[in-house]
């Protein structure tokens, strides 16, 4: 890969020289920063096993190199990168993988290390969704995740990625992360705080990332990070795990934030060393047991990860003064829920006891049971998955429910050809040579559900959401 010119402020270089361990070469750091970042993906094991994914993609000639800290993660090299963007491949469109930077897979690996199996998890700064979807896969869509995003424009992207990956156990909120300690004290088994930061580690992806860098800005950001980690720590139950991470390299936003928390609650904070997280983790290990990943160590983005345990309760914060408002949903009664479940099963949609039916007017939703304890404490932007809308003739099943709940071995499943699948993703009706018998057709490609169609004569009426419709060149190579 070609070199590219990264902008470095002099004060930043001075700071890095001081921060870099003696075991690392500063010249190697500069050289690594000038190299473009390696592309990487994470297989979505909610949809496909790693072995099956490797078999499916073997004919493409992709070079997939395993990422040591994530069994589902791979660095990827493709000969036809310019001919077809990775995001336009059939496997990406159907949610079989997520394009995710390798080092950003580290925090979730740390969160679930040593057999940790949390049932209620919060991702404090979740967009665009790489870590939320990784957490959901580790939880196998069980339990519940509260995924929060402060930026309103990024909440839509977060939901789109969660939906594409077939995730059903997530509730979305749109708050400043500093509210949660007071709003939901001691409610979570595990919390990921991938904190907003100065982004010093992303120069391989964005050579101008440091154009507005200054030591003063770092100090302001670190002050916000201290408030965020304090809030997250209050929301964590005693015995729970907190992972703090950034994509920056200075110690003020990293080690110092974690040490501040320990100084503030000396009897409640225990640092959990990460030296055994994966083979070679000790190369990035700090004396506190954190991972301070300079880009030359593993040829990835610069990153920082710390894991800690809350060993005992701490004094509560004052209760919030805001009102959440009335919750507009009501649980569906058992008898009606049974009828809905049977109607859904008839078209290939099934769910387990981790999800419960709720209703708002003509809308039917499935909420993760583990999130119900938070109802009335926070206001949700979106909760669970929308299953259907009711109408006179029955139910209008929703696309996100099909992606999350359908299995390809259903009797209504109908496998499309590559050309027909492209037509589907372009929002067009499909005219198969031999039309299926059923009226409600579970449309699949590569034996993966990609939507639900109505059969009208020999035509499959497209229900792919308009906001997801693709144009341009897709996986068959036709524009």
Swiss-Prot record:
Keyword Glycosyltransferase on entry: no
Domain of life: Bacteria
Active site as annotated: 247
EC number: 2.1.1.178
Cross-referenced InterPro entries: Methyltr_RsmF_N, MeTrfase_RsmB-F_NOP2_cat, MeTrfase_RsmB-F_NOP2_dom, Nol1_Nop2_Fmu_2, Nop2p, RCMT, rRNA_ssu_MeTfrase_F, RsmB/NOL1/NOP2-like_CS
Single annotated GO MF: RNA binding
One Pfam short name: Methyltr_RsmB-F
Residues annotated to bind S-adenosyl-L-methionine: 125-131, 149, 176, 194
Family: Belongs to the class I-like SAM-binding methyltransferase superfamily. RsmB/NOP family.
The name this protein goes by in its record: Ribosomal RNA small subunit methyltransferase F
Provenance organism: Shigella boydii serotype 18 (strain CDC 3083-94 / BS512)
């Amino acid at each position: 890969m070609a070199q590219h010119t990264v902008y470095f402020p002099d004060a930043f270089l001075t700071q890095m020289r001081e921060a870099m361990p003696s075991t690392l070469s500063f010249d190697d750091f500069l050289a690594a920063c000038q190299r473009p970042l390696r592309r990487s993906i994470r297989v979505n094991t909610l949809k496909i096993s790693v072995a099956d994914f490797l078999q499916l993609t073997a004919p493409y000639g992709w070079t997939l190199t395993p990422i040591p800290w994530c069994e589902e993660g791979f660095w990827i090299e493709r000969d036809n990168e310019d001919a077809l963007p990775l995001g336009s491949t059939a496997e990406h469109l159907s949610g079989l993988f997520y394009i995710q930077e390798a080092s950003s897979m580290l925090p979730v690996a740390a969160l679930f290390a040593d057999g940790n199996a949390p049932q209620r998890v919060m991702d404090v700064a979740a967009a665009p969704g790489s870590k939320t979807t990784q957490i959901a896969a580790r939880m196998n869509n069980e339990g519940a995740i509260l995924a929060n995003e402060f930026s309103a424009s990024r909440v839509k992207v977060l939901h789109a990625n969660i939906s594409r990956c077939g995730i059903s156990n997530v509730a979305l909120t749109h708050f400043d992360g500093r509210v949660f300690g007071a709003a939901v004290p001691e409610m979570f088994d595990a919390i990921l705080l991938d904190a907003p930061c100065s982004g010093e580690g992303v120069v391989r992806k964005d050579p101008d990332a440091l154009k507005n860098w200054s030591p003063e800005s770092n100090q302001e950001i670190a002050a916000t990070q201290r408030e965020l980690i304090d809030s997250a720590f209050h929301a964590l139950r005693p015995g729970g795990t907190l992972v703090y991470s950034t994509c920056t390299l200075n110690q003020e936003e990293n080690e110092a934030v974690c040490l501040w928390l320990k100084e503030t609650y000396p009897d409640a904070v225990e640092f959990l060393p990460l030296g055994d997280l994966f083979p070679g983790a000790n190369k990035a290990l700090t004396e506190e047991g954190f991972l301070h990943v300079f880009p030359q160590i593993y040829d990835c983005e610069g990153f920082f990860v710390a894991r800690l345990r809350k060993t005992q309760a701490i004094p509560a914060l004052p209760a919030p003064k805001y009102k959440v408002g009335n919750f507009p949903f009501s649980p569906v009664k058992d008898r009606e829920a049974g009828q809905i479940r049977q109607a859904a099963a008839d078209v290939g949609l099934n769910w387990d006891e981790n999800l419960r039916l709720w209703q708002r007017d003509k809308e039917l939703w499935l909420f993760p049971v583990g999130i119900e304890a938070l109802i009335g404490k926070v206001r949700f932007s979106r909760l669970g998955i929308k299953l259907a809308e009711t109408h006179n003739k029955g139910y209008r099943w929703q696309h996100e429910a099909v992606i999350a709940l359908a299995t390809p071995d259903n009797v209504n499943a109908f496998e499309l050809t590559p050309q027909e699948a492209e037509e589907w993703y372009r929002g067009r009706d499909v005219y198969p040579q031999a039309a299926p018998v059923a009226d409600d057709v579970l449309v699949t490609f590569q034996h993966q559900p990609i939507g639900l169609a109505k059969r009208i004569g020999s035509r499959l009426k497209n229900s792919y959401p308009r906001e997801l419709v693709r144009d341009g060149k897709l996986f068959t190579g036709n524009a």
